């Protein structure tokens, strides 16, 4: 049976494990390659090979369920088919993969597995050769009878095909040209049988056994076609296709596959997908859509692009947590302890979370609230959201919205677009795997807007408790219930949030911290965290509270603690260098005992390496200056108030409260008012309003020196330092009046006074916002007297008691009260006019 011209495969073959089907000798099959080992085989062997030998690979059927593929190599089937890779096509959609066109050559047996990585290689034993069958007829006897029966059945099958006469004739010539010994493999590959049955044919090494395995398959195919033909005679209007012809490569001509309507249970996993759909516990509307898509999927050939799109859609649908949820932990005492351990202060936020837990205990069907934490950077808005999730025992997912300017990021893309995908909300639910997580919508005030739509408008449905129970993502196109999701948004300011979106959220202000709170936070959380991050222990580094307070006051100026943590990290790095150098010295070779005393000092001095430091290293103000350099901020308030025409105001920014200097000077001119400092329209109007009020009350406060007009022959220049920063708002009105009154009267404003408040033309002081942040900024600057509008008295309750005790608050209802409080000894007045009360 040997042949000089027969194919001789190498004794060592790389193995391609496939679950797409069973490759038989003499047939051609397309194989999709996407696993790591198979991808590496294609890249290293097929794409880089230059000889015919490099294109011969061993194809091993993988009997393992593809769903359970893992990094481990599955147990190999003992019999495989050596194949010639005649075509390799790569693609990146929907994921990176290769499609191989492989022609089966002969069987082989795996003798020994030589290696598993990067792809398996085995020592193989060749079992048969396709060319050997061309040298003679099969032996007489039972084998000859089997081969003749098989040939006659194959001819009968071809004659039953519902095709044109030329095609049938061509198939008949193909059967006649093939050696009868090759018919079992070729016909078993052509007809639609299960992988298990094809595997039995592959395992039949003996030719007689092979005929016995393949003949029943061919007979069953013929009986099925006879039944279908009878059915068509009874129902002539039935235009269903009895079978279809698929072109493909085959030896020696072309291969034809007979495709029945019944799907292959092993090779096609749509049945598995259907079971997943039914087990996903979807709502009725979603289930109807999925079943409809499944029916379409079964009718599609896998080569259609829409097949992959539909399959990806169904896989997304079954992976969503339609009915999976976590059980909330409603223990209020445990929640209070956990929140207190995670975050210091933030009493308002903790109170709101505990209220939610209490109501959930009384009403289990309570919808999740929509909270919005508004405050300066670094105060812990994002981290408190994570703590809330831990408190409730829920999954946590953060969605960064800063810079998002496409509404498709929220609502997803429609499936008609190439590369369509769900929005961030649905993707987040898929990631956490439950339908009641805590979603943190970070930086919601920094949403953009573009030609692709407004994402803030897309959030209106998501954040509306009356609508989000039927949120419809464009990709899914079916409603999804978001009512059990706890949404928490964070923002630095509400000014840039659209009013309609802001109205849907419960806004909780998160103000900045006092110095005492920062010290406590540093020693409870920041210092232990930085010690752990830098590999240090409390026995190696200690930062006293006085040093922490010095870092806060002289090296940071912020409402939060982010910059404080960076400075503590810088201290830890400097100490880590000392500790590492000391360990290096201590590990160096120790001198002998007789030379230890005279050599120790000289070694350290000569090498220039410091001796191991004494533990613990305590950071005092001297060490702090060596590490962080000279102080970045100094309390310069008293130095800048040495001339008339300077006053201190209080401003609110998204970064927290700030003190703001206002400077004024006068010169000869034509009564003009000049404003500098990059001011907004509202602040410019406040300056003109202050000038008008002072001009109308110049005689009352003895400011005109006998002239008819306060500004006669005089120009006034009003400047707000930090000119690179845009400034606007009405709260600087009282500061401008005080500054101009100081300039025109020649009297100094008290150096420990700061003020805020809006003014009217009648001299009333109206309330403003951001009182707590402004007061904390004044406290950081060591100011002692704070002038605020009388109607802001209620806001003083939010200020910590220790801060209130350090400050003297003046509640002013009129500008007369402001001027009397801003100057030592009060501000002189010619008459005692009655107080005007605001009824606005």
UniProtKB/Swiss-Prot annotation:
Keywords noted in UniProt: ATP-binding, Hydrolase, Nucleotide-binding, Peroxisome, Protease, Serine protease
Catalytic residues as annotated in Swiss-Prot or TrEMBL: 731, 774
GO molecular function, one term: ATP hydrolysis activity
Protein's GO biological process: anatomical structure morphogenesis; protein import into peroxisome matrix; protein processing; protein quality control for misfolded or incompletely synthesized proteins; protein targeting to peroxisome
Gene3D superfamilies given in the database record: 1.10.8.60, 1.20.5.5270, 1.20.58.1480, 3.30.230.10, LON domain-like, P-loop containing nucleotide triphosphate hydrolases
UniProt domain Lon proteolytic: residue ranges: 641-825
Its EC number(s): 3.4.21.53
Summary of the function given for this chain in its UniProt record: ATP-dependent serine protease that mediates the selective degradation of misfolded and unassembled polypeptides in the peroxisomal matrix. Necessary for type 2 peroxisome targeting signal (PTS2)-containing protein processing and facilitates peroxisome matrix protein import.
Membership in a protein family: Belongs to the peptidase S16 family.
Protein's recorded name: Lon protease homolog 2, peroxisomal
